[in-house]
Amino acid sequence: ENLVAHSGGGEDYIQMYDSPGDDVFTVAPRLATLTGPGYSHAGYGFYVSLGYATSTGGADGAGGRDVAEMQDSTGIDKVKVGDAVGRETTKDTVRVSNWSATDQPYFLRTKGFEEITVLSNGGGDLARIFDSAADDTVNASYDEVTIVTGSNLEKPGIARKKATIRGFESTIAYSVWGGSDTLNLFDSPGDDKVVLRAHKAEMSPRQADTPIFTGRAFSLVHAIASAGAEKYDYVRMHDTVLVDLLVAGYLDGETWASLSKPADGSAMTQMYDALGFDVVRAVNDYGDSPRNKKDVDATVDFLMLDGGWDEI
């Protein structure tokens, strides 16, 4: 069957619901389509477009594998993947919106889809991405940010398996729902700067005043500089109030450094590491009483030390 609905203007909204099979919801400002086994529906001109993957039927008993493809406008838009702790009803949603008085306002939302892609059409957009209660992985570059929901928990609380954000001028990813989340930062072919702190990781072009990507409260951060040959990449690692351990050397011919903090007992847990950077700067923000520790290969020539670091 094929159904088409047209808005006559005003603040009309359309809601579309999936089938027991594999469905695809495609939505952009003033346009929404939902297709699946034996049907295709479309809505035109609606101020608000909502897509729901709520069916539990089908051969898998879970309503199939449903995909959402979303686009924003050419204005200044906002995207929110999931939600903050305490907002249970919206943690499995993806929202795209623009309420600017100078742009044509709209609101798009999906709920319960296993895989979601959001494409920016420019305009100075901001994306915010929230984790699940599982062990999630975020892969971030300037062009694309992907979050993959961990499979370690039987019920991570959301249907989302993967969400991809492409082309956004600024993205913030949050690790707030629990689990042991990992953030992988990938550089560009140009000169890049990464700043790593225990509560926050930032990545930007070296001369930029503000970060393009920010990750907050991730358990582990990997920064990887592998794009392009003629470039100069810089990473700055900050310590904690504890007695941290800095390790630096070469890994398969590439520069490598890591910073770890004390965990239970005498064990150390790695906070972040950096691979392939031209310069690594380790910063002691909390003074020399007691001093941090370091284990640095004698051949290392890429490391800068701020403050006190005692050789182990």
Where are each of the predicted segments found?
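Acidic, glycine-rich low-complexity segments
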Residues: 1-312
